[in-house]
Amino acid sequence: MQVKEVMTSNIAALAPNNTILDAAKSMQAHNIGCMPVCNPDGKVAGILTDRDIVVRSLANNGDPKTTLVKDVMTKNVITAQPDMDISTALELLATNKIRRLPVVKNDTLVGILAIGDLATRHIFLNDAGQALSEISEPSRPANMTQ
């Protein structure tokens, strides 16, 4: 099975010069916690999660009205291709400890593959579960008081 058979197509993307307030509103409108960031030519410039907004901006007193997506997004994004085998994509997810792969064709965003897509479709459920367990590490809050 190939990535194109499972990926989500026609996805919303952010621009690098959007503010994180715009990004948060877009995430809320689409009920998602992660969005690819694309240049005007459609090439993937990065990926932004709701956690990036909180940890890389708000927790550092960043102003959501002026902080730009490009300043807090993850750059050098690992991507998949539509014709890639699902097992190869799972390996990329697990090896790189990530949960989502933007899917590109000719360097242009065409979709996104999330580990949840595989699990909810019962595709390679054991492999997806294994990959998820490899990328998920127990969270240990730092200096948490009761």
Locations of regions flagged by a protein language model:
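The conserved cystathionine-beta-synthase
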Residues: 13-31, 38, 80-97, 104
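N-terminal first-folded block
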Residues: 8, 12-36, 44, 48-49, ...
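A glycine-centered beta-loop-beta connector
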Residues: 27-30, 35-51, 93, 101-116
